[in-house]
């Protein structure tokens, strides 16, 4: 019980040390002494409810008759650390997102324009789509498959909310809605590759439908034009892979965007559209060999492909002194060693620049292999055809071009993969576990033709390390898959393709190594995986070639709708 807070005597009686009758407003002693009766202010009672001990005992006695079931532990509403979704988004922003203004470097693609989704509400479709992507890649680096169990719920809610938003006209015309569909499509491709799930085309088709709702391209915002540019690049690579022409509507979008920009990447997409056209024309001619086709048509097509290749060479010459490639030599002994074919290694100003130059090489390889197939097929039915081919389209010239392009892709592998010899984890970001070649290692840099380089868009060493770690092996998947499919695809065509001694086994080994670096399981033989990752005590060449041939079909399917970020 609490004590009585009333004072026992007035201050005057306390000072005189006499007994006080505690009468108010003035006690009897003060009245007799004609003194001012002063009282101390009462002490405020604490706002605490005191319970009599007998009541507490009685309460415990009554409850003891009942069986006590402990409550399960609960997560506090306001935890002292960030939840896993917040950690995943922070990791994604720090290590995946590229600068939207690369200071003279190539345009960054999808990962340079996702900040609006990151900044949006966590419960919006864009916010949930970025959460799904972030949780998926974070689970890969954290090596925690339990995180992926949260993704279907987030993904399903994003799609459900997006479907409601699409019923509103303003939402259909929103840049953020288009970004959401692009992120959902990218997530589908990631899951297809990393977790062997079926890739879907529905989000890609949805993005195309949204662009049609945008109206006249001349009224699009700058960010909308960037998103459409990503879609155009996807359509171009898809058309080349499927040996068809690009849809007329996509061509129209590209023509309008091209009239308002001088971006070299957008011009490269223009050239890619023409590459798809040439490939389609060649396929149609091959089907009509000896039936309603003439040598003049073949000569004209070969000449057109040669002129287009010259445009691609000119494009490379214009950007190479700014973005690379530049020859690189190691500044010191590196362990584990960087795996390079015959010691050849090229560096670029960024991982994104390496990606764009390999896009160019893939276009030129498509033209070269298409020309070579056309010459071989028509040479069988018309022996005098090969003798009358113009010099620039001769078999020897095309073979030399293919070899040079293959060498270029091989020389970009060390830049993207460095000396990595195991699948990545979060520890790789806390300490510089691996070494990646960079422009910072060189005092002087020269372009393809001996001209002094003028590098633009050079990433800092820390940014290059994180981007090479997270995106280098991912971007090399399509390039190495292209080479493996080209060399191991058509058995009748393989003998005509050039390859240096030991180059095909090296390409297959790097392809399998790249699968392991991305934590994509391709065999149950852990010893074989270790040999492929380290490059030491490798199995015979026929084993590497056989394993790569078996795996390339699955990866190629997973890459079908993927736009490299």
Predicted region positions:
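Intrinsically disordered, low-complexity acidic/Ser/Thr-rich segments used as protein-protein interaction/activation
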Residues: 76-94, 98-313, 317, 321-355, ...
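Charge-rich, intrinsically disordered regulatory segments
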Residues: 1-124, 151, 551
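Amphipathic alpha-helical interface elements that mediate macromolecular binding in regulatory proteins
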Residues: 8-11, 28, 156, 205, ...
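C-terminal effector modules of eukaryotic transcription factors
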Residues: 297-565
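Short amphipathic alpha-helices and their capping/turn residues within compact interaction modules
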Residues: 18, 32-35, 42, 135, ...
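Alpha-solenoid repeat junctions
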Residues: 38, 138, 188, 239, ...
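Short coil/turn segments at secondary-structure boundaries
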Residues: 42, 142-145, 378
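Alpha-helical recognition domains of nuclear gene-regulatory proteins
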Residues: 12, 29-30, 161, 210, ...
């Amino acid at each position: 019980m609490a004590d009585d807070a009333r004072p026992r005597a007035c201050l005057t009686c306390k000072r005189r040390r006499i007994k006080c009758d505690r009468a108010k407003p003035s006690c009897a002693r003060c009245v007799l002494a004609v003194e001012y009766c002063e009282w101390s202010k009462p002490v405020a009672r604490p706002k605490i409810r005191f319970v009599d001990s007998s009541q507490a005992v009685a309460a415990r006695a009554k409850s003891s008759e009942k069986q006590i079931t402990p409550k399960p532990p609960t997560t506090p509403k306001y935890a002292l650390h960030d939840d896993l979704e917040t950690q995943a988004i922070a990791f994604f922003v720090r290590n995946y997102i590229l600068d939207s203004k690369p200071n003279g470097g190539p345009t960054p693609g999808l990962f340079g324009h996702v900040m609006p989704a990151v900044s949006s509400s966590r419960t919006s479709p864009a916010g949930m789509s970025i959460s799904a992507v972030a949780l998926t890649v974070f689970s890969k680096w954290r090596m925690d498959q339990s995180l992926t169990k949260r993704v279907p719920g987030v993904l399903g809610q994003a799609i459900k909310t997006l479907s409601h938003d699409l019923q509103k006209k303003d939402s259909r015309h929103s840049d953020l809605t288009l970004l959401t569909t692009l992120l959902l499509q990218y997530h589908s491709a990631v899951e297809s590759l990393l977790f062997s799930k079926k890739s879907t085309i529905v989000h890609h088709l949805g993005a195309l439908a949204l662009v049609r709702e945008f109206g006249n391209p001349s009224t699009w915002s700058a960010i909308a034009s960037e998103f459409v540019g990503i879609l155009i690049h996807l359509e171009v690579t898809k058309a080349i892979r499927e040996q068809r022409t690009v849809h007329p509507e996509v061509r129209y979008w590209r023509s309008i965007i091209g009239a308002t920009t001088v971006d070299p990447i957008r011009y490269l997409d223009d050239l890619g559209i023409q590459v798809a056209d040439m490939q389609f024309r060649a396929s149609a001619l091959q089907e009509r060999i000896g039936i309603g086709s003439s040598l003049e048509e073949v000569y004209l097509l070969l000449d057109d492909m040669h002129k287009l290749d010259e445009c691609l060479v000119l494009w490379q010459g214009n950007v190479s002194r700014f973005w690379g490639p530049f020859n690189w030599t190691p500044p010191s002994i590196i362990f584990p060693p960087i795996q390079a074919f015959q010691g050849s290694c090229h560096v670029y100003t960024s991982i994104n620049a390496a990606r764009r130059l390999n896009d160019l090489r893939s276009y030129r390889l498509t033209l070269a292999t298409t020309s070579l197939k056309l010459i071989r097929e028509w040479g069988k039915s018309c022996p005098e055809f090969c003798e009358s081919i113009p010099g620039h389209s001769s078999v020897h010239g095309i073979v030399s071009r293919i070899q040079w392009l293959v060498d270029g892709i091989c020389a970009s592998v060390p830049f993207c993969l460095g000396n990595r010899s195991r699948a990545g984890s979060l520890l790789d970001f806390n300490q510089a576990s691996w070494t990646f070649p960079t422009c910072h290692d060189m005092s002087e840099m020269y372009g393809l033709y001996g001209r002094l380089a003028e590098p633009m868009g050079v990433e800092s060493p820390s940014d290059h390390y994180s981007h090479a770690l997270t995106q280098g092996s991912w971007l090399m998947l399509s390039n190495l898959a292209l080479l493996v499919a080209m060399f191991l695809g058509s058995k009748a065509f393989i003998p005509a393709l050039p390859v240096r001694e030991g180059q095909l086994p090296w390409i297959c080994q790097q392809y399998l190594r790249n699968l392991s670096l991305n934590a994509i399981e391709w065999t149950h033989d852990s010893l074989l995986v270790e040999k492929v990752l380290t490059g030491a005590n490798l199995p015979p060449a026929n084993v590497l070639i056989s394993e790569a041939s078996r795996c390339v079909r699955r990866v190629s399917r997973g890459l079908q709708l993927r736009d490299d970020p």
